[in-house]
Amino acid sequence: MVHLSDVVVTKVSNTVLKHKHATRNTLARNRMLARLTETAKQGALLATHDNTELMWLRRHVGTDDIAEPEPYLFCFQHDWDALTSAERALRTIKGLAEFHPDWAFWGYDAALIWGLEVPNDLLGPRFLVKTGCSVTLSSGCRLLRPQMAGALERVDGVRVTSFWRTVEECLLRAPFSYGLAIADSALRAKGVSRGDLCERLRADCEGRRGYRRAQVIASYADGLSENGGESRFRAFFIAYGFSVPELQVEFRDPLDSSQVFRVDYFWRLENGTCVIGELDGKGKYTLQDGGDRGSVDP
């Protein structure tokens, strides 16, 4: 039996308690900041199902340089501010895929995951395959029936429609100039011809809404286009009745034959006159270290 006289009561000062509390807070802060840093290196947003982590992160949104650009998805504010629209969309999709493993993406979202050129104006609502998602989807989501999605693939940890199914679904919906950017990048990625793309569309999409527009887009697609900006400006030439230019034509420097230059657009007129067109990206005027030329916002 233990007697009260044997019990020693030790009084812990408030200073010690505060120190322990501060230590726990510091450890939690360091742990979460490390996770945010690691997630940023992976090109994604931090997604967490842990209520303790979620409460800590939301308490510090607006402080500690932490932002919550989408519900349950977190990152450093300075990282988010530095991203392009396409980079933000790409990280959001990867974060959602981490938070909702049962989600699958199609359309413009899948095109981003496949590395295709998706103009900024097409970014916004999520494109999800209707696979019995575990949570209620927000308004504005574009749903696709599983039987229309076909076999799904996993790319960078994200479930998406196959490469060519993704391209087809985009071309069935995209306006001409936007669709041309996607089609050009698809040909460039796979090294196939516009004829191959037209045949795929005929075999898979004939009779569907948007098929005729998709075929027009495919008939002008050219894998030599180097970025979405070049594709969209070529689409404007086509739409306004100008001759379709040759792309990436090479010229030798008359002063140094070992140097070769390529031009974005080249026209040879009927009278023999040659016209060169160049699309200069913003990066050309901002890069100071001789890096590669940038492209305009598509």
Which residues does each predicted region cover?
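Surface segments flanking catalytic/ligand-binding clefts of nucleic-acid enzymes
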Residues: 7-16, 23-39, 48-52, 187-298
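Short gly/ser-rich loop at a beta-strand->alpha-helix junction or flexible surface loop bordering the NTP-binding
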Residues: 1-210
